[in-house]
Amino acid sequence: MSDNTGAPDVQVETTSVFRADLLKEMESGAGAATASGSDVTPPAGAGMLVVKRGPNAGARFLLDRPTTTAGRHPESDIFLDDVTVSRRHAEFRRQDGSFEVVDVGSLNGTYVNREPRNSEVLSSGDEVQIGKFRLVFIEGPRA
């Protein structure tokens, strides 16, 4: 007997998943870059965002440009595909060795450590919320 129901085949996208010990350290507030054997430390002078909660939990985004865009627009550097995210939601800006998140007029706002922010200089371990995505910021060693 055939299992054909007339429904089209569904393609599934996958992302990398972190070790359970690393996720526990991130949730407890410990610096993810200090995890023993951690492979999530970004290169010197760069930063990284790790999706802690959201449809693509575990995905990593390297912040190695002066400006990195995040939003629902397919041309965003960090593409977050969900209706709770504005097309052009936020920018991550690197300047003078530090990183800042700037809300660029989103509908639902950008949060840092669960507080609404128009802009905020980030520290390693900060949690940035864009729509229903929660991303942990990890800062690489100083260049």
Swiss-Prot record:
Using the UniProt annotation, give all residue ranges assigned to the region (Disordered).
29-50
Q: Fetch the Gene3D superfamilies from UniProt.
A: 2.60.200.20
Phosphothreonine modifications at: 14
Q: Which residues form the FHA domain?
A: 68-117
Q: Name one GO cellular component term.
A: cytoplasm
Major place of residence: cytoplasm
Instruction: From the Swiss-Prot or TrEMBL record, state where the protein is found.
Output: Cytoplasm
Q: Which UniProt keywords apply?
A: Cytoplasm, Phosphoprotein
Briefly, what is this protein's role? An essential component of the PknG signaling pathway. When unphosphorylated, it inhibits the activity of 2-oxoglutarate dehydrogenase. When phosphorylated it does not inhibit 2-oxoglutarate dehydrogenase.
Name this protein carries in UniProt: Oxoglutarate dehydrogenase inhibitor
Source organism (scientific name): Corynebacterium diphtheriae (strain ATCC 700971 / NCTC 13129 / Biotype gravis)
Q: What is the lineage of its organism?
A: Bacteria, Bacillati, Actinomycetota, Actinomycetes, Mycobacteriales
